[in-house]
Amino acid sequence: MSGPSDETAGDLPVKDTGLNLFGVGGLQETSTARTVKTRQAVSRVSREELEDRFLRLHDENILLKQHARKQEDKIKRMATKLIRLVNDKKRYERVGGGPKRLGRDVEMEEMIEQLQEKVHELERQNEVLKNRLISAKQQLQVQGHRQTSYSRVQARVNTGRRRASASAGSQECPGKGLRFQNVDEAETVQPTLTKYSNSLLEEARGEIRNLENVIQSQRGQIEELEHLAEILKTQLKRKENEIELSLLQLREQQATDQRSNIRDNVETIKLHKQLVEKSNALSVIEGKFIQLQEKQRTLRISHDALMANGDELNKQLKEQRLKCCSLEKQLHSVRFSERRVEELQDRINDLEKERELLKENYDKLYNSAFSAAHEEQWKLKEQQMKVQIAQLETALKSDLTDKTEVLDKLKTERDQNEKLVQENRDLQLQCLQQKQRLHELQSRLKFFNQESDINADDLSEALLLIKAQKEQKNGDLSFLEKVDSKINKDLDRSMKELQATHAETVQELEKTRNMLIMQHKINKDYQMEVETVTQKMENLQQDYELKVEQYVHLLDIRAARIQKLEAQLKDIAYGTKQYKFKPEIMPDDSVDEFDETIHLERGENLFEIHINKVTFSSEVLRASGDKELVTFCTYAFYDFELQTTPIVRGLYPEYNFTSQYLVHVNDLFLQYIQKNTVTLELHQAHSTDYETIAACQLRFHEILEKSGRIFCTTSLVGTKGDIPNFGTVEYWFRLRVPMDQAIRLYRERAKALGYITSNFKKPEKMQLSSQQAATTAQISPAESTDGNLNELHVTVKCCTGLQSRASYLQPHAYVVYKFFDFPDHDTAIVPSSNDPQFDDHMCFPVPMNMDLDRYLKSESLSFYVFDDSDTQENIYMGKVNVPLISLAHDKCISGIFELMDKEKHAAGTIQVILKWKFTYLPPSGSITTEDLGKFVCREEPEAVQRLPPKSSDVTSVVAPKPKPRQRLTFVDKKVSFADTISHPSPETSPPPKDIKDSSPEVGPKPENGLSAVAYPSKESGVAKVEENVGEMQQGKEDDISFLSEGQLASGSVASSEDETEITEELEPEDEDRSASDSDDCIIPSSVSTNTKQPSEEIRIEIIALNLNDSQITREDTIQRLFIECRFYSLPAEETPMSLPKPQSGQWVYYNYSNVIYLDKENNPAVRDILKAILQRRELPHRSVRFTVVSDPPEDEQDLECEDIGVAHVDLADLFQKGRDIIEQDIDVLDARTDGGTIGKLKVTVEALHALRSVYEQNRKDLEA
């Protein structure tokens, strides 16, 4: 048989064997031709075409899958929507029989189910087709590598190679009988293979066509499904709209039903509450009524007993009053003279110190600020200032003389008033004695009339009848004449006796009547005199108040003038000159870097930061490879906004970016430069996004020591962690004005401010000591452990010869010490001074028990001097240990002690004073040994002896740690005695805690290296008692001031001294006011009994201020604001600091609170004011008035403070409403124009308890 004919058989070249071959060659030719034809049939479709067709089918299959999934998701969404709609519809039908079911819902559900079934069928067909494709691919691969029935093709020409094996040799050289048999087998196998491959190809082609048809049919079905989906969407939208309408109707119905139900429930709840409240009130009233009845019974019994004791107590009270008056007169005279001498001595010392400071300051100012060219102008100005100062001094002296005259007159009037009061008391006593005698006589006369039953008229009538009878019977009854005469004689005698007694009683009554008339006349005269004296006293009081107001006004004017002059002097001496320059152009700068000149005003400077380039490390370069990095840097300096360098491409970026900052070289800026760093971040840009790849810290502290451009490099650290060493950054910075000039000006300015503020603190220190004495005197000695309570006064006067660790800076010194078991106490910071004046006074109330006695005899008081400008903590400038054994022997410790640093070198001196207020009485069980007596400082008034260092086994005292301080100089604010214990003042930082084993260099050594100039003084008990009385009196009188804190803080040194002079001699009737106020005194909580009840105080808190968008927010002259609070005629209180003006819609927080005390003993006038408010009298200031005041800026101190807005809180309305104002916003009205609302003020006014207390006290007067 011949093989199948093939049209492409002639396409391939076939070797012609020729006609010389035998029959065997012809058979071989036919077999090879068949194999060639089958291979041609298999290779008719190329491998690339098959792969291309397969890949196309694969891609189309994937697309069909994606499309089918999308359609499946859409169908699922539609199904869920339909389920929700059906559930909602069923629910609405259950609730209220909603809309009827639509007719096409069932059809749509059936259609959706049919579509889902079709999708599942298509997915199954798709999987079947995919499996067929995979099997076809595997078959094609098998066909491409199909093994023939021969392991190798036999060569037609003998090449002479060895045969592979014997079996191969036997195949190639078969026996003669087997040769043609093998050829037949080959011819039978090859046709079957070709047929099989052709059939497979045909099947694959048919399947591919079927797949194409299926794809086309699926596309048509998908289009139909999409069309159906759109129809379903439209139907769903229509159904959704209908359901939404029905839902809205149902919701409206439900809302109306719920509202009506809620209203009914609310009404029932209200009625129930009212019923419960009324029943509770009725039960409470019944209980109160029963209690009142019981109390009335007990009161009747106690009233009878009290009336019996009242007479005895009145007699004792009269005797005690007489004794008290005599003792008060003696005490007042002695106390007044001693206080006057002490005050004058203190004033002299303060004025001498102030004169020395001013002289030093003036010399420094003259040497540093005045140049030779303008010397004459400065001299003229200096002379003018001296003339003005002399004029002001003369005016002050005249004011002081007038004040002293007024005070002398007031003293004489007081003496006269006391004399008149004493005379009035004597006359009242005499009047009471006469009344008592008259009462006794009247009682005796009544008793006589009642016992004798004889009346004068009856007696005269009886005598007349007897006489008539005698005349009638004279003739007939003569024998009875003798008897009648005897009877008449007896009657006459008795009559005469009765007449004599009657005349005596009448005479005594006349005498008492005349005496009572005289006493009445004398009392009238005394009343007239008292009225005239009180009138005179009221007139004098009014004149005195007017004069005081005039003096206050004059002092305010004088303080404003002095403040203006000080501002001018500071501007001339301390301020920098205007600095105008054109920046120099360096060779490495671009020409157009600066295009205009820069004007620096007084106190300003220009700080420049230049980022040059970034050098990446080798690790970064290896990691980046051939890619170019696109980078830029960002950093934020001080309180300015973020700066960004240009974006640079490359592995060696050079930015050459310079940023300039206009800064004020002040304390905060210098501290920021010295301590803080600036974070520079390196970012990599990716089209519109970026990521941070590295960061570093830029330091600028070297600018304090160098000038000009300072070049620095710093290391970059990777943020991701894989490359820690990222590279380096090169940068430079500088100040345009040289830094040494700015530092010098800053030091002088800080020193001048320190001198000014230290003078303000002196009168407050005096008030501190006096009020501490007053508060301590109120503590009962019985409350201590041993029954004895004493008070130790520690005064740190000054330090001299202090040196900072940085040689070019002056220290900001302050002293810290810890006494007994009290917390650490630190003084105020005196900036930029080698010889700081602290004048810090502190009182420590302690019980005189065994623990204190042991502490005084075995311990020393360590004083540590720290530098606030030193960056290293726990490093003190100097330290001294003062032995306290002299205090155990009731002696004063006063002297100048040498300070030692941590290396035991001399670091200056410190002057301290330690003394007891009362006589120190050691406890009964204490034993004084000879060893302890060695530490007593010997009294040497003439020779000054330095004590050698002595070693003692004294328990080591841990050094206090310096606390972090703010560099703001503030004035210590008064707080109440109760607030001092329970609520610490927010403006004073908390005391430092004890630190044990904090560092080896801070802990004190066991030896006492002490060299002192000691002046111990023995004080007697009588002198200390008199001193205590004087200090208490001074503290009570100093507490009364007609100047507000704002006026005190804004005034000058002279004005603060004048304030102390004005307040030093006020009325003794108001002395008790200091009991309700006291400065920050350390009082143990165990002996604190002066806490005020809520009914004895009014608390006012100013929380925050908010301004609307008005003219005030747009005015440039108004920059800082503070709040003033005033109640009736009481002194105004101000917030301690003025804050920047808030923008529209923003709040600024003051958090300032003030307490007005209303205790009956010390503040009856304030209670009278509240009584008048409750009576709703027409008072000028019946509400609490808050005034928003603008504070002029520092560079324009010649401007005056201006009232911007006013807010009110009416106390009568508060009492009527029955609730306090707690953090409520009240309207602030414009105080300058039409009175419109300009903002809100958030305040707290707690006065309800106080108003209720006043109302209960004066209920009868208020209800009448």
UniProtKB/Swiss-Prot annotation:
Chain intervals for the UniProt region annotation (Disordered): 979-1018, 1047-1093
Q: Which UniProt keywords apply?
A: Cell junction, Cell projection, Cilium, Coiled coil, Cytoplasm, Cytoskeleton, Repeat, Tight junction
Lineage top rank: taxon: Eukaryota
- Give the record's family classification: Belongs to the RPGRIP1 family.
A Pfam family matched by this chain, by name?
A: RPGR1_C
Query: So which tissues is this one expressed in?
Result: Ubiquitously expressed. Not found in heart and skin.
Q: Name one GO biological process term.
A: establishment of planar polarity
What protein am I looking at?
A: Protein fantom
Q: Care to name a GO molecular-function term for this sequence?
A: thromboxane A2 receptor binding
UniProt-listed InterPro entries:
C2-C2_1, C2_dom, C2_domain_sf, RPGRIP1_C, RPGRIP1_fam
GO cellular component terms given for this protein = axoneme; bicellular tight junction; cell-cell junction; centrosome; ciliary basal body; ciliary transition zone; cilium; cytoplasm
UniProt keyword Repeat, yes or no: yes
Per the annotation, which location comes first and is thus the protein's main one? cytoplasm
* Signal sequence annotation: none
Q: Where is the composition biased (Acidic residues)?
A: 1056-1080
Organism, by scientific name, is: Mus musculus
Quaternary structure note: Interacts with NPHP4 and NPHP1; NPHP1, NPHP4 and RPGRIP1L are proposed to form a functional NPHP1-4-8 module localized to cell-cell contacts and the ciliary transition zone; NPHP4 mediates the interaction between NPHP1 and RPGRIP1L. Interacts with IQCB1; the interaction likely requires additional interactors. Interacts with TBXA2R (via C-terminus), RPGR, NEK4. Interacts with NPHP4, INVS and DVL2; proposed to form a complex involved in DVL2 stabilization. Interacts with PSMD2.
TM annotation in the entry? none
Q: Which residue windows are coiled coil?
A: 64-143, 196-268, 299-454, 488-555
PROSITE patterns of this UniProt entry?
Answer: C2
UniProt keyword NAD, yes or no: no
**Function, please?**
Negatively regulates signaling through the G-protein coupled thromboxane A2 receptor (TBXA2R). May be involved in mechanisms like programmed cell death, craniofacial development, patterning of the limbs, and formation of the left-right axis. Involved in the organization of apical junctions; the function is proposed to implicate a NPHP1-4-8 module. Does not seem to be strictly required for ciliogenesis. Involved in establishment of planar cell polarity such as in cochlear sensory epithelium and is proposed to implicate stabilization of disheveled proteins.
Residues of the C2 domain? 577-714, 773-897
Write out the annotated subcellular location: Cytoplasm; Cytoplasm, Cytoskeleton, Cilium basal body; Cytoplasm, Cytoskeleton, Cilium axoneme; Cytoplasm, Cytoskeleton, Microtubule organizing center, Centrosome
Provide the gene name from the record: Rpgrip1l
